[in-house]
Swiss-Prot record:
Start-end of C2H2-type zinc fingers: 94-117, 124-146, 164-186, 192-216, 827-849, 855-877, 883-904
Cross-link Glycyl lysine isopeptide (Lys-Gly) (interchain with G-Cter in SUMO2): residue positions: 110, 119, 231, 255, 259, 271, 363, 417, 428, 439, 472, 697
Protein name as catalogued: Zinc finger E-box-binding homeobox 1
Subunit organization: Interacts (via N-terminus) with SMARCA4/BRG1.
Listed GO CC annotations: cytosol; nucleoplasm; nucleus
Gene Ontology biological process terms from the UniProt entry: cartilage development; cell differentiation; cellular response to amino acid stimulus; central nervous system development; cochlea morphogenesis; embryonic camera-type eye morphogenesis; embryonic skeletal system morphogenesis; keratinocyte proliferation
Length: 1043
């Protein structure tokens, strides 16, 4: 560049902060920057070699006009300081006078101006801006940025109906939700956050892909610091040793394998759409301090389970990252523990725990030795798996649990913090007497055995068959199980808890209740086991096979009384469930009688007791204070479902006894009949679905306790309100624990502690029954009934609408009706206050709560959130490809693939087609030329042939000509075949034969002449031509014969 064109001013601007020297300073300063680029020369002054180099350049850059001062100042690249006050790198850049792009090197700026702003004959310049391009395709692509709507390219076939247009860039979409996600690109909103790596996404599809890819499932610390709530597994308890023989069950893998728990968030911050995940303490009965680590998709609460109750009773909720779900699943451990305590005759499990703590007699127990239960408060939950999403879309959460000592249970309202997720394998609650697999299938029970005898979570899980040996050793058939007195304080030591639990039983001697609970669990799993299964059960329980067989027969015949608080026979187990009444937990004494019924779904007998006062333990809010009173949870198995009832009047009277017992009706419980005791439980026959916990929105003072799964689950919500976890009916309005399961899937558990914030877990079937317990002092509450019957939920905002469509083909009870409109014709979400105009919108919205994609492919069972996605997916199975490119003819089954192709086709689509056509044309032309030359050479007389030209022929050329001749012959044969179809095949063949004979004779003559004249390559050429003609003649003859 000529020196005179460079600015004369050599001033170097200080620190780039004063750039007001305009273009002159800019250019000169850049020359300096060019030389200062390398680290070694950072501090050197201006190098004159640069000027010399610029003067030697052949191409001079002519600037139409000098850049304006204010233009330079106004560009963000030219001015600016970083947040620390130091001039940032951009402030040191040289900006282009035409487009304000910044460059650190002057040479880079020169190149930019040359290639983008210098116009010449070879360049393609944009008519709307100063950009120039070397290739037309680049210009065409660039021109799209000036178009008002890029959808112009899409206006082909189905592209003309894009009615949702972006106001920012003009891009249009066929569906509103596509525009919604597109707008996030402009706004910068990224509502989807990966719970593992904290990466955020604006599109749900990107989020789902990221989660499915499992690229960030490791528990690596973020920014060098371990994430709170995601600390590496720690097994503080000395007895908590990793047992190599207890690998995580395969059920935990699927999509959520190795996903660590997310930091707990409070219920009121859980939204229907992805939100910032933060710590969200949930108001719960004082929970047990469980530092629970999660590894391999399993939440292990066996870590430090301490019975210390927090004065506030605030429990950290466990947030399980939802696999592909928008919002995480928040599980209140204290709620779940309450449920689990009662689940298998919670007392039995507790007793098992006691026994385990007292003496780890069974090998399995020792292997699973997840101690920390000994720390005063035994955590019921030793491990929680992340939600497992099956192929059919059903979701299940597997809970490995062990019940606490009665005192702890009563103190369940202890501070339950899930802060240190530890690997499940290494940290398990010491006494995992039962592996609780929450399943909703008829043959699946809480034993945690999918197969009937295997633990879903661990192979060595003490639960199921493994847990039984411990009990069997201490089995005392004649020792009646007596409800333990409630432990007044959470801090009560285990020993006292265990003794209290079982009345007179010593911790080393499990009461009959334990065995009964285990037997019931087996019964719930399989009501009619074969001889082999019976023998396994007998071995695990350490009872004679005849005894076990007779017990099963009696259960099937309904001879075993469903409910005696302390039946000598294996009928009942008392469970103390602490109700969270303010700071004092209310122990719930629940006795679960054995199932009475010939069928595996024998009705559950409920002891009816005085109605529970709404005021005391029912208040969902943490504030309700009531003296701790044991909840008597006696549950009997109903013919088709279980109900959990809590008897409120037992060991320590409450302000009013919390009576959650259901009437003893074996056959009627399944019917949607009002239950005389506390609540009207809408009961519908349910296949045995273990622990199907329906989520109900309830006012703070509502309480209900019904369980509709095989195992009786009576839960007192952490909010001191009993949680109704009856699958058959959910009558309660409890804001706490919600476990919903699809008919044939394991229900997921989620605890909700906010009064009107019920969050359901994925793949749940929601149905509601409008039954209000007459005893309820509060206004009638609309009850949510899992699996099937729809009820209006009591929500101040609107009448709840339950969409059966959201259910996963609920096989159990048929839903009464599908989504129901509210009074004003709108569709209201039963899980939040949102209202929608269309049922399809509600279905999609439900996905935010449940993770259940409403539209499922009938062939591969893949589910989609939007119906049109399913429609396009089905084309993969049908092979339909309705979208076609008008340039290259390529077809597409998905509109997205087609749109992407159309958007970028100008860079390759047309060229590919042209290249393909050009190549074909060239080949055809080459073939024709070769044939013409060949025929001409064959027909030419030897005398006319130039000897020099013949000498120039090489063998390779002859071979090439032969190949071309063969190709030509092939083409001719194809033409002949077509002509034969027209009836002219024979005559033409004869003519060709004659011509070829003549050609052959000429070839022979030419060969002889060539041999006489030359003895080099020419004779070979003649012979090759002769052979070629002969071969072609033979081929034509064969073709004729075939014709």
């Amino acid at each position: 560049m000529p020196e005179d064109e460079l600015p004369a001013d050599q001033t170097v601007l200080p620190g780039g902060s004063d750039r007001e020297g305009g273009a002159k300073n800019c250019w000169q300063d850049d020359v300096k920057d060019d030389e200062c680029d390398s680290d070694a020369e950072n501090e050197q002054n201006h190098d004159p070699n640069v000027e010399e180099f610029l003067q030697q350049q052949d191409t001079a850059i002519i600037y139409p006009e000098a850049p304006e001062e204010d233009q330079r100042q106004g560009t963000p690249e030219a001015s600016g300081q970083d947040e620390n006050g130091a001039a940032d790198a951009f402030s040191q850049l040289l900006t282009c006078p035409y487009c304000d792009r910044g460059y650190k090197r002057f040479t880079s700026l020169k190149e930019h101006i040359k290639y983008r702003h210098e116009k010449n004959e070879d360049n393609f310049s944009c008519s709307l801006c100063s950009y120039t391009f070397a290739y037309r395709t680049q210009l065409e692509r660039h021109m799209t940025s000036h178009k008002s709507g890029r959808e112009q390219r899409h206006v082909t076939q189905s592209g003309g109906n894009r009615k949702f247009k972006c106001t920012e860039c003009g891009k249009a979409f066929k569906y509103k939700h596509h525009l919604k996600e597109h707008l996030r690109i402009h706004s910068g909103e990224k509502p989807y956050e990966c719970p593992n790596c904290k990466k955020r996404f604006s599109h749900s599809g990107s989020y789902s892909s990221h989660i499915s890819s499992k690229k960030c499932i490791s528990l690596m610390p973020v920014n060098g610091r371990p994430r709170s709530g995601l600390k590496t597994s720690q097994c503080p308890s000395p007895s908590l040793s990793a047992s190599p023989g207890s690998p995580t069950r395969p059920q935990i893998r699927q999509k959520i394998e190795n996903k660590p728990l997310q930091e707990p968030l409070s219920v009121n911050q859980i939204k229907t759409e992805p939100v910032d995940y933060e710590f969200k303490p949930i108001v719960v009965a004082s929970g047990i301090n469980c530092s629970t680590p999660l590894q391999n998709g399993v939440f292990s609460g066996g870590g430090q389970l301490q019975a210390t109750s927090s004065p506030q009773g605030v429990v950290q909720a466990v947030v399980l990252p939802t696999v592909g779900l928008v919002s995480p699943i928040s599980i209140n451990l204290s709620d779940i523990q309450n449920v689990l305590k009662v689940a298998l005759d919670g007392n039995v499990i507790r007793q098992v725990l006691e026994n385990n703590q007292a003496s780890l007699a069974s090998k399995e127990q020792e292997a699973v030795n997840a101690s920390s239960i000994q720390q005063g408060g035994h955590s019921v939950i030793s491990a929680i798996s992340l939600p497992l999403v099956d192929q059919d879309g059903t979701t299940k959460i597997i809970i490995n649990y062990s019940l606490e000592q009665p005192s702890q249970l009563q103190v369940v309202p202890q501070n339950l913090k899930i802060e240190n997720p530890a690997p499940t394998n290494s940290c398990k609650s010491e006494k995992l007497p039962e592996d609780l697999t929450v399943k909703s299938e008829k043959d699946k029970g809480f034993d945690g055995a999918v197969d009937g005898s295997t633990c879903l979570l661990y192979d060595d899980c003490p639960g199921d068959l493994n847990a039984l040996p411990e009990l069997k050793k201490h089995y005392d058939p004649e020792h009646p199980a007596q409800p333990p007195p409630p432990a007044p304080e959470a801090e009560k030591p285990e020993a006292s808890a265990s003794s209290a639990r079982d009345g007179d039983l010593s911790p080393s001697q499990p009461p009959l209740k334990n065995l009964l609970s285990l037997l019931k669990a087996y019964y719930a799993l399989n009501a009619q086991p074969n001889s082999e299964e019976l023998s396994k059960i007998a071995d695990s329980v350490n009872l004679p096979l005849d005894v076990v067989k007779k017990w099963f027969e009696k259960m099937q015949a309904g001879q075993i009384p469903g409910q005696s608080p302390e039946p000598p026979s294996p009928e009942t187990g008392t469970v103390n469930i602490p109700a969270k009444s303010d700071e004092q937990p209310q122990p719930a004494d629940g006795s679960e009688p054995q199932e009475d019924s010939a069928s595996g779904q024998s009705p559950l007998k409920m002891t009816s007791s005085p109605v529970l006062p709404v005021g005391s333990a029912i208040n969902g809010s943490r504030s309700c204070t009531s003296p701790p009173s044991p909840l008597n949870l006696s549950s009997a198995r109903s013919l088709q479902g279980y109900f959990c009832v809590a008897d409120g009047a037992q060991e320590e009277p409450q302000v009013e006894p919390l009576d959650l017992s259901l009437p003893k009706q074996q056959g009627e419980l399944l019917e949607r009949s009002t239950i005389s005791s506390v609540y009207q439980n809408s009961v519908y026959s349910v296949q045995e679905e273990p622990l199907n916990l329906s989520c109900v929105k309830k006012e703070p003072q509502e309480d209900s306790c019904v369980t509709d799964s095989e195992p009786v689950v009576n839960v007192i919500p952490p909010s001191a309100n009993p949680i109704n976890i009856a699958i058959p009916t959910v009558t309660a309005q409890l804001p706490t624990i919600v476990a919903i399961a699809d008919q044939n899937s394991v229900p997921c558990l989620r605890a909700l502690a906010a009064n009107k914030q019920t969050i359901l877990i994925p793949q749940v079937a929601y149905t509601y029954a409008t039954t209000v317990s007459p005893a309820m002092q509060e206004p009638p509450v609309k009850v949510i009934q899992p699996n099937g019957n729809q009820d209006e939920r009591q929500d101040t905002s609107s009448e709840g609408v339950s969409t059966v469509e959201d259910q996963n083909d609920s096989d159990s009870t048929p839903p009464k009706k599908k989504t129901r409109k509210t009074e004003n014709g709108m569709y209201a979400c039963d899980l939040c206050d949102k209202i929608f105009q269309k049922s399809s919108s509600l279905l999609r919205h439900k996905y935010e709560h449940t993770g259940k994609r409403p539209h499922e492919c009938g062939i591969c069972k893949k589910a989609f959130k939007h119906k049109h996605h399913l429609i396009e997916h089905m084309r993969l199975h049908s092979g339909e490809k309705p979208y076609q490119c008008d340039k290259c003819g390529k077809r597409f089954s998905h509109s997205g693939s087609y749109s992407q192709h159309m958007n970028h086709r100008y860079s390759y689509c047309k060229r590919e087609a042209e290249e393909r056509d050009g190549t074909e044309q060239e080949q055809e032309e080459a073939g024709l030329e070769a044939l013409m030359n060949e025929h001409v050479g064959a027909r030419a007389s030897p005398s006319q042939a130039d000897s020099d030209e013949r000498e120039s022929l090489t063998r390779e050329e002859d071979e090439d000509s032969e190949k071309e001749e063969e190709e030509e012959e092939d083409k001719e044969m194809e033409e002949l075949q077509e002509e034969k179809e027209c009836g002219n095949a024979q005559a033409e063949e004869e003519e060709e034969e004659e011509e070829e004979e003549m050609d052959g004779a000429k070839d022979e003559a030419a060969a002889k002449t060539d041999g006489a004249v030359e003895n080099g390559a020419a004779p070979q050429a003649g012979s090759l031509e002769q052979k070629a003609s002969e071969s072609s003649e033979q081929l034509s003859e064969e073709t004729t014969n075939e014709a």
